[in-house]
Amino acid sequence: MTDYARYIDHTLLAANATEQQIVTLCDEAIAHHFYAVCVNSGYVPLVAEKLKGSAVQVCSVIGFPLGAGLTSSKAFEAKAAIDAGAQEIDMVINVGWLKSGKIDAVKADIQAVRGVCAAIPLKVILETCLLDDEQIVLVCEMCRQLDVAFVKTSTGFSTDGAREEHVRLMRSTVGSEMGVKASGAVRDRETAQRMIEAGATRIGTSSGVAIVSDDAAAAGNY
């Protein structure tokens, strides 16, 4: 039987997320033994304090949700998040640069963040709903070359979330050594299982409790 809890990055990234909601997120993650709690960098100090002494990892998004900021800003934010207690980093690529053919700039953007979190896992968010298959493969290959830990489908803030076919393509491109994180619109156990079967090794969701309990009514009201 699948141990769904160990796949889950329990996530709350909404602009209007309150401190109490973040505390609840952490309490749920500890109670259900989720892999990580994923939040915006401003909440990393709170999450690090709440999770202290537990096995749950602190994950921060960077350049979220657009990925369109300066590379130097992303690197600075990543370092600040790590200094505040982040143990994993999820960064968004610059999709506009990719679609403009600025491949070297996209690579340098990832490399800059990779440089400041060399000691911890980096997950690179592609925003697959905005890319064609060729672009997905290109970024996955780039991440493999840069020794990135995970490629990740989506922010959950664009036109679509994780799709099985994209997870499958990402897995086939990066091979068995790298992680693949499916995020966005994974709200129940059935969807999570499909993503895992397609090759996902981590699930980003605010519905972790619903997934592990197989009870849609238990989804977080985030």
UniProtKB/Swiss-Prot annotation:
One of its GO terms (biological process) is 2-deoxyribose 1-phosphate catabolic process. It is an enzyme of class 4 (lyase). InterPro entries: Aldolase_TIM (IPR013785), DeoC (IPR011343), DeoC/FbaB/LacD_aldolase (IPR002915), DeoC_typeI (IPR028581). One of its GO terms (cellular component) is cytoplasm. It comes from the Bacteria. Gene3D superfamilies: Aldolase class I (3.20.20.70). Pathway: Carbohydrate degradation; 2-deoxy-D-ribose 1-phosphate degradation; D-glyceraldehyde 3-phosphate and acetaldehyde from 2-deoxy-alpha-D-ribose 1-phosphate: step 2/2. It catalyses: 2-deoxy-D-ribose 5-phosphate = D-glyceraldehyde 3-phosphate + acetaldehyde. The active site is at 90 (proton donor/acceptor), 152 (schiff-base intermediate with acetaldehyde), 181 (proton donor/acceptor). Its EC number is 4.1.2.4. Signal peptide: none annotated. Keywords: Cytoplasm, Lyase, Schiff base. The keyword Membrane does not apply. It is found in: Cytoplasm. One of its GO terms (molecular function) is deoxyribose-phosphate aldolase activity. HAMAP family: DeoC_type1. Belongs to the DeoC/FbaB aldolase family. DeoC type 1 subfamily. Catalyzes a reversible aldol reaction between acetaldehyde and D-glyceraldehyde 3-phosphate to generate 2-deoxy-D-ribose 5-phosphate. This is Deoxyribose-phosphate aldolase. It comes from Pectobacterium atrosepticum (strain SCRI 1043 / ATCC BAA-672) (Erwinia carotovora subsp. atroseptica).
